[in-house]
Swiss-Prot record:
UniProt signal peptide: none
Keywords: Cytoplasm, Methyltransferase, rRNA processing, S-adenosyl-L-methionine, Transferase
SUPFAM superfamilies attached to this UniProt entry: Putative methyltransferase TM0872, insert domain, S-adenosyl-L-methionine-dependent methyltransferases
Residues given in the record as S-adenosyl-L-methionine binding sites: G36, G37, H38, D55, F86, D103, Q110
GO molecular function annotations of the record: rRNA (cytosine-N4-)-methyltransferase activity
Pfam (any one): Methyltransf_5
Designated name of the protein: Ribosomal RNA small subunit methyltransferase H
EC numbers for this chain: 2.1.1.199
Subcellular location: Cytoplasm
GO annotation (BP), single: rRNA base methylation
HAMAP family listed in its UniProt record: 16SrRNA_methyltr_H (MF_01007)
Superkingdom, taxonomy of origin: Bacteria
GO cellular component: cytoplasm
Length: 308
């Protein structure tokens, strides 16, 4: 267990604790429990807080359960997609939910496990958060039509040469299907000219998002979160697609006027804001945190306070 403590560094931990400073009691929902780092710190700091932890990865959840042993009776852990499980929690606990945390990053345990397919040297081509899911990265890369690959590379990877990459993958798999993540990574490196980032980075991002329906789940969650009352919502994202969805949702939550934009005059009473955005600009890791945990470098945290 000490090895896990050393391996896993929760991103923006102090900033998360700061965001939830007003919370003293009630229920906090950690929608992406992972290895339980944020949850453990919050339960330690707030003795009257109850926690609901959600995660697709049952293996990670078992580790989190062990780490949270000292808080037995103060938490419940749920398996499954966080959008669906959060909706269920909100239906049951309602206004008792005082805080919601979403950390959209992949855990170090998943990234470093060569059997999971998240890193460039993996012996698998998987990328599933939920190991019971049918769709994995191998199916996407080896069997998706070229037009579908183009779409996910364009929309989820924001890759400029999405057509070229999709066609090259199709040409290669016709001769020899990709067997693992290293095979795919090496192939992409053989013809990519991008020197700023690893040639496989954006392709892996796009495939991972497709395999886990990450953006669809985030959209569903953000829609459901509108029903929170008096709660603090804290979301940590790791790429522009996620951050854009969160930023726009928070702006929408904070709108006073909900009239048609084509209207010349407000007729809605101009008091429909669900709360206030607490972060004018996203909070990012300090240089010291990035130095200690390079994987935190792209993290952005936004916080919203819902009205009671």
């Amino acid at each position: 267990m000490q090895e896990i403590e050393n391996l896993h560094q929760s991103v923006l931990l102090q900033e998360v604790l700061q965001a939830f400073t007003p919370l003293e009691e009630g229920v906090l929902v950690d929608c992406t429990l992972g290895l339980g780092g944020h949850s453990k710190a919050l339960l330690s700091q707030k003795p009257h807080l109850k926690l609901i932890g959600i995660d697709k990865d049952k293996f990670a959840q078992e580790i989190a359960k062990e780490r949270l042993k000292a808080f037995e009776g103060r938490y419940n852990l749920l398996s499954g997609g966080f959008a669906k499980r959060f909706k269920e929690a909100l239906e049951i606990h309602g206004d008792r939910i005082k805080g919601v945390l979403v950390d959209l990053g992949v855990s170090s345990l998943q990234l470093d496990d060569d059997n999971r397919g998240f890193n460039f040297h993996s012996h698998a081509l998987d990328m599933r958060m939920d190991l019971e899911s049918d769709l994995n990265a191998q199916k996407v890369i080896n069997s998706y039509p070229v037009i579908a690959l183009e779409k996910i590379f364009r929309d989820y990877g924001e890759i400029k040469e999405y057509k070229k990459i999709a066609h090259k993958i199709a040409e290669r798999r016709a001769k020899k299907p990709f067997k693992d993540a290293k095979d795919l990574s090496d192939f992409l490196s053989s013809f990519s000219k991008n020197k700023k980032i690893h040639p496989a980075t954006l392709v892996f991002q796009a495939v991972r998002i497709e395999v886990n329906s990450e953006l669809e789940e985030l959209k569903e969650f953000l829609q459901c979160a509108r029903n929170l009352n008096g709660a603090i919502l804290c979301v940590i994202s790791f790429h522009s697609l996620e951050d854009g969805l969160v930023k726009n949702a928070f702006k929408d939550y904070a709108k006073n006027c909900i009239c048609d934009p084509l209207s010349f005059q407000c007729t809605c009473s101009n008091n429909h804001a669900l709360g206030a955005i607490l972060t004018k600009k996203p909070i990012t890791p300090s240089p010291e945190e990035i130095k200690n945990n390079r994987r935190s470098r792209s993290a952005k945290m936004r916080v919203f306070q819902f009205k009671p």
